[in-house]
UniProtKB/Swiss-Prot annotation:
Compartments, record wording: Secreted
The organism of origin for this protein: Crotalus adamanteus
Principal subcellular localization: secreted
Upper taxonomic lineage: Eukaryota, Metazoa, Chordata, Craniata, Vertebrata
PANTHER family documented for this protein: CYSTATIN
Family of the protein in this entry: Belongs to the cystatin family.
Tissue specificity statement from the Swiss-Prot or TrEMBL entry: Expressed by the venom gland.
Function of the molecule: Inhibits various C1 cysteine proteases including cathepsin L, papain and cathepsin B. This protein has no toxic activity and its function in the venom is unknown. It may play a role as housekeeping or regulatory protein.
Pfam families, per the entry: Cystatin
Top-level taxon of the source organism: Eukaryota
Protein name, entry field: Cystatin-2
Gene Ontology annotations for the cellular component aspect, listed alphabetically: cytoplasm; extracellular space; vesicle
Keywords: Disulfide bond, Protease inhibitor, Secreted, Signal, Thiol protease inhibitor
Signal peptide: 1-24
Length: 136
């Protein structure tokens, strides 16, 4: 019995060392940097921009000109945190392909802002929500 208990303790110790090594210093549930090219990250940012444009009173659509920071956090779904620079495009609202819309360059029409977005996604429930949005 003592031998079995000792084996179990050693096994648990070994397993915890392996898990710590595999996870590194990253905390479970903690924020981690994310690549804007990851499909889930790109979809979340696209959703945030669609919501931003829908809620904006501007007659022109805006789009991301630079991703300053993208992070994600595993919770009871995935939370995405973005800091982006956005600019006003020459395309009016309702345009479907904003990626091909040029930015305004006329001083009176050009407008750039830095925005932060928080998007909450539960993929297995087909749920996505813009939790926070702020632009300056």
């Amino acid at each position: 019995m003592a031998l079995l208990r000792g084996f179990l303790v050693c096994s648990l110790l070994l397993l915890s060392c392996i898990c710590k090594e595999a996870l590194g210093t990253r905390l479970l549930g903690g924020l981690e940097n994310a690549s804007p090219e990851e499909p889930g990250v790109a979809r979340a940012l696209q959703f945030a921009m669609n919501e931003y444009n829908r809620g904006s009173n501007d007659m022109y659509s805006s789009r991301v000109s630079e991703v300053v920071e993208a992070q994600k956090q595993i919770v009871s779904g995935i939370k995405y945190y973005f800091t982006v620079k956005i600019g006003r495009t020459v395309c009016r609202k309702g345009a479907t392909d904003l990626e091909n819309c040029a930015f305004h360059n006329a001083p009176k029409l050009a407008q750039t802002m830095t925005c932060t977005f928080e998007v909450y996604n539960i993929p297995w429930r087909n749920f996505i929500s813009l939790e926070k949005s702020s632009c300056t």
